[in-house]
A protein has these predicted regions:
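Extracellular loop and loop/strand-boundary signature of outer-membrane beta-barrel proteins
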Residues: 231-233, 266-269, 306-312, 349-359, ...
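Residues that define the transmembrane beta-barrel architecture of outer-membrane proteins
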Residues: 210, 239-243, 275-279, 317-321, ...
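Transmembrane beta-strand segments of outer-membrane beta-barrel domains in Gram-negative
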Residues: 286, 291-447
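Periplasmic polypeptide-binding modules associated with outer-membrane biogenesis and secretion
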Residues: 19-234, 246, 264-277, 416, ...
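Outer-membrane beta-barrel translocator/receptor signature
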Residues: 211-212, 223-230, 235-292, 300-305, ...
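Residue-level signature of outer-membrane beta-barrel architecture
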Residues: 218, 249-251, 285, 327-329, ...
């Protein structure tokens, strides 16, 4: 049995295939942690966290630039200035505004500038309906009074949707308080985080002077949506083609809640000898600046390996549970800052001929803290997240390694992470989308926790092999050009319906990905693919991502293979329908 395990020592943990002369069986990625389903799960989890981030705020400039004016014949000497009713302006701001206009001879334009500056100070804080005015007064004493009417929010009106608890969860505590645009934007973001919502906001006059109401328009979005699709992003050993089905329930409790369930399965099996399946369930409920979220994922893989004249059944099961909260802590004209914290428990089980392999099976608990920034900068939209993942030795963790050495997998470590997603328009109607992920671990991890490079969800141009490492980074780049613009179906004549469903919104895109991994420790027994390396891939594709019917096809090729074997051209497809 020892010789069998030695031959399979690089396969059961689902590591990358080493160089062909390394003595490893000539197979691709096997079952268990590290399979394509594991990469798909990580991709989905990252995408879900990205979808939870609010979009960057408007870059509108609220503050007016102070203007210098010289004394004129029609001016009045102002020796002192008070701003009355400005309870939401700090004493320092009031003092700064007063100092700007005292000790000067002010004309009519200067008085208007003073009012603009007071209004601008309110608008900079989001109080867009508060107004400053000059009451009737005598300026013979040299004292100037500015009075502020702080605009109050009297209520909300919902059109197209039932009010239910929407005000309570999206705009808690705003009624009968000074109107703050930042809080309204936050509530609108909580509504529009639901995939099929596109709520619009309008501020309208209230029933009394100095008051306003907010009208929310949202065409009836429906409660249940879903999509079904197929692709060939799976492993050849466990099922290259896979089918996917997802159901999404939105606002079913009236709490702007969102729930989703997904089931995936390999489309081509082999009488139970090989196959893969994946199940996930996610949910989130907001409350003002807070959002509570959770998720559960499970995947199974099985395939058979022939080596040393014997047939062996390899199996793997992974489960992942996550629960946490996020909060928007800052919102201004630069961007939006969000903090997240969550607990995660991941378990993985590898078997050989249905016998559990203790050294390749474990439970790992984590505590994760993240800070994200959504902003408009450099001519584009950017989402940046810094995270810190702490592997803990309690609250669910179990491992066969009681006193792990440097080369053994650890359960207690610290792993900083970095994620960047950017969208930048380019000349000639091009759009550049870049995605960066990097991580560094202070200890060697189980392979299911290590960075995996090579595949449709990381560095494209690879499928059967990948790199693993405790440290590394990768970048994905798409440059797209939409050639079938919305409305083009009107030029299709009798085929207008076909064009609208299958062509409208289609785009060509180019692919350029790259990445690197490092083991993070030294060991003579490591195969090249586990020591680390640099890989890159490029390709071309055509896709349609909008509308009820979506599809994607691309062809990629490695341009830097590092220690990985040659795979040639890789063709990928995806097609599905939304409802």
């Amino acid at each position: 049995m020892r010789s069998v395990l030695g031959a399979l020592s690089f396969v059961v943990p689902c590591v990358a295939q080493a160089a062909p002369d390394a003595g490893v069986p000539a197979v691709g990625l096997p079952a268990g942690p590290g399979s394509s389903q594991d990469q798909f799960q990580r991709y989905q989890q990252r995408q879900q966290q990205l979808d939870m981030l609010p979009p960057p705020n408007s870059d509108t400039e609220f503050l007016t630039t102070p203007r210098q004016s010289s004394p004129t014949k029609g001016c009045v000497d102002v020796k002192s200035l008070t701003i009355e009713g400005a309870s939401h302006l700090s004493a320092a701001t009031r003092a700064m505004l007063s100092a700007r206009y005292t000790g000067r001879c002010l004309g009519v334009s200067d008085f208007n500038h003073a009012l603009d500056d007071v209004n601008g100070a309110y608008m900079a804080q989001g109080h867009v309906t508060s107004r400053a005015y000059l009451p009737e007064q005598s300026l013979q004493s040299g004292h100037l009074r500015i009075v502020v009417v702080e605009g109050m929010l009297t209520g909300f009106q919902f059109e197209g949707i039932s009010p239910r608890f929407h005000e309570a969860v999206a705009f808690p505590g705003l009624r009968d308080h000074i109107l703050n645009l930042r809080d309204l934007e936050q509530g609108l973001d909580q509504m529009n985080r639901l995939p099929n919502w596109s709520a619009k906001m309008q501020i309208v006059p209230g029933g009394a002077p100095g008051t306003s109401a907010v009208r929310i328009r949202q065409p009836t979005p429906g409660y249940i949506h879903g999509q079904i699709w197929a692709d060939n992003n799976g492993q050849y050993e466990t099922g290259h083609e896979a089918g996917h089905a997802m159901l999404i329930a939105q606002d079913v409790l009236g709490l702007l809640d969102m729930w989703s369930v997904e089931y995936d399965h390999s489309l081509v099996g082999d009488a139970g000898r090989r196959g893969t399946q994946y199940i996930s369930a996610n949910g989130s409920i907001p409350f003002g600046k807070w959002t509570v979220f959770g998720g559960w994922w499970m995947s199974d893989d099985v395939y058979h390996l022939q080596t040393l004249g014997e047939d062996y059944r390899l199996g793997g099961r992974r489960k992942d549970f996550r629960f946490g909260v996020s909060r928007v802590v800052a919102r201004n004209r630069i961007g939006v800052t969000t903090l997240q914290a969550f607990y995660e428990l991941k378990s993985f089980n590898s078997t050989l001929d249905r016998v559990r392999l203790q050294t390749q099976s474990a439970r790992q608990a984590y505590v994760v803290a993240q800070a994200s920034e959504s902003l408009k900068a450099w001519g584009g939209i950017w989402y940046m997240t810094l995270g810190m993942r702490f592997g803990v030795g309690a609250v669910g963790t179990h491992s066969a390694y009681d006193n792990p050495g440097e080369a053994d997998p650890h359960t207690q470590y610290v792993k900083p992470t970095l994620d960047i997603d950017g969208y930048k328009p380019l000349p000639l109607g091009l759009l550049w989308h870049t995605s960066v992920h990097g991580e560094y671990s202070t200890r060697n991890q189980f392979t299911t926790d290590q960075l995996q490079l090579g595949g449709p969800y990381t560095v494209r141009g690879f499928l059967r092999q990948m790199l693993l490492g405790n440290d590394g980074i990768y970048i994905r780049n798409d440059v797209s050009w939409q050639f079938a613009h919305p409305g083009m179906n009107h030029g299709c004549g009798a085929y207008a319906g076909f064009c609208r469903l299958f062509v409208e919104g289609a785009e060509l895109y180019g692919i350029l990905d790259g990445g690197m991994t490092r083991a993070g420790y030294r060991s003579r027994a490591l195969p090249p693919a586990l020591k680390g390396g640099n890989i890159a891939g490029a390709g071309l594709g055509i896709r349609k991502t909008t509308g009820s019917i979506f599809w994607n096809a691309n062809i990629t090729h490695a341009i830097a293979r590092g220690p990985l074997p040659h795979e040639g051209w890789i063709a990928a497809f995806q097609a599905g329908v939304r409802f």
